[in-house]
Amino acid sequence: MAAPAMLPGQAVKTPGSIWAKAIEHANEERKKPGADGRGDAFCYFVGSRAAGKSTLLNRFLYPTRAEVPKPSEGIEYTYARKPAAFDHEKKDLAHIWEVGGSQEFAEEIVNSDQLFLTAKQVTTAVVVIVVDLSDPAGVLPTLLYWVEQVKKKLGSTYEKFEKKGLQLPEQLRQRAKSKLYSANEDKDTVYHSGISLVIAATKYDAFKNQDPEVKKVMSRVLRYIAHAHGAFLCYLSGLHGASEGSGAEDAALLDNFTRLMNHLIFTGLEKKPVLKMQPQIDHTGPIMVPAGFDTFKSVGRPRSQGEGTVAGGLAEWRELFEKMFPGVREKEAKMSAKGAKFVIPEQYKEEEVDAVRQRKVTDLENFRKEQAAAVEAAKKKALMAKAQQAEAAAKKKAGAPAAGAKAPAKASPNGTPPRRPSNAGNQ
């Protein structure tokens, strides 16, 4: 077998056999911009409860397994490796998190300085927003909530770079724009996040028998939001096993999703993904739209025929979506409600452990109340002290004695100093 050819003028520093030189050449190639030698990837699976995040992640990691994993409560971590081209090379590593549990917990993760789209992660970050087609009214609130969380966290992370005068945020945005939208007529209108964003609409098998008009509105809304935010859109079904009469279709959808994720995680946006499945925008079947394929004109708008702002188009689609799927507002209100309690599933309950936990929770709540009361008392004390200082300053300025000070003794009419009271009677 012949060794890889060297380019003219390339210096090889490693002495020894031709294979040692070939290895050095391969390593140098990996260090070049756009080569496969990337840093670790960081991937997050987020979305509503019971949307199938755990199942989808399990099928991505183990495509041939149709096991039903336990529901996730909190955040779960796993990783994936890509085999290296040579035995001596470092394998590409992807850190993968699934964010589950309550909405309040999810917000804690999103707002953490150590997790979710940190400065270290944004260059190779992938976010998969999982929405549940078997709960149509919850699709739009879930999707808009997580899109907003991604944008908010990226904004704060990018701001840290920009304050230091670094151009990385703009470079990431331009990378996404040039690789995915270079030939798209909406390239200057789309929000380019700079990261890989995927919208995975699961449980299509529970939605596919809906009225065609219902399916049309759902597909158009998802396509509009995906295109507006530079995201990939994939319908998925049969994740627990092939659904009746749709085994080949389910397998093709999963295979396409797996190929897409492997590319985004281990290659990234340095190269445009090449997928085996052709884009599918027919609402009568499962939708699959790569980022950069759609246009606002193709998606259309309910009233204004594609004219106007992106926000205006979203408002029109939202209005139609709410009419088609009652309960959207209630879902949003539930998602935005604070103080959601962590609920322990029945099969995991243990009386002694739960009692100890409840005591700890109560102690924590009491401690927080005491801390809040102490802070409030300190604020009141500071305000009172400030008011007294202001009063004293005002009296001093007016020439009046400050509170607690003795007034000077008045002189007698003839100018002699006042006599002190005699203490003789007391002696």
UniProtKB/Swiss-Prot annotation:
GO CC annotations on file: cytoplasm; cytoplasmic dynein complex; dynein complex; intraciliary transport particle; microtubule; motile cilium; plasma membrane
Pfam families: Roc
Induction notes from the record: Up-regulated upon flagellum biogenesis.
Gene3D superfamilies, A to Z: P-loop containing nucleotide triphosphate hydrolases
InterPro entries for the chain: DYNC2LI1 (IPR040045), P-loop_NTPase (IPR027417)
Membrane-related topology note: Peripheral membrane protein
Keyword Cell membrane: yes
Disulfide-linked positions: none
Residue spans of biased composition, Low complexity class: 399-411
Keyword Hydrolase: no
Region of interest called Disordered, as start-end residue ranges on this chain: 383-427
Subcellular location: Cytoplasm, Cytoskeleton, Flagellum basal body; Cell projection, Cilium, Flagellum membrane; Cytoplasm
Broad class of where this protein is predominantly found: cytoplasm
BP terms from Gene Ontology: intraciliary retrograde transport; intraciliary transport involved in cilium assembly; motile cilium assembly
Entry keyword set: Cell membrane, Cell projection, Cilium, Cilium biogenesis/degradation, Cytoplasm, Cytoskeleton, Developmental protein, Dynein, Flagellum, Membrane, Microtubule, Motor protein
Subunit structure: The cytoplasmic dynein complex 2 is probably composed by a DHC1B homodimer and a number of D1BLIC light intermediate chains. Interacts with FAP133, FLA10 and LC8.
Summary of the function given for this chain in its UniProt record: Functions as a motor for intraflagellar retrograde transport. Functions in flagellar biogenesis.
Family, per entry: Belongs to the dynein light intermediate chain family.
Record protein name field: Cytoplasmic dynein 2 light intermediate chain 1
Organism: Chlamydomonas reinhardtii
Native organism taxonomy: Eukaryota, Viridiplantae, Chlorophyta, core chlorophytes, Chlorophyceae
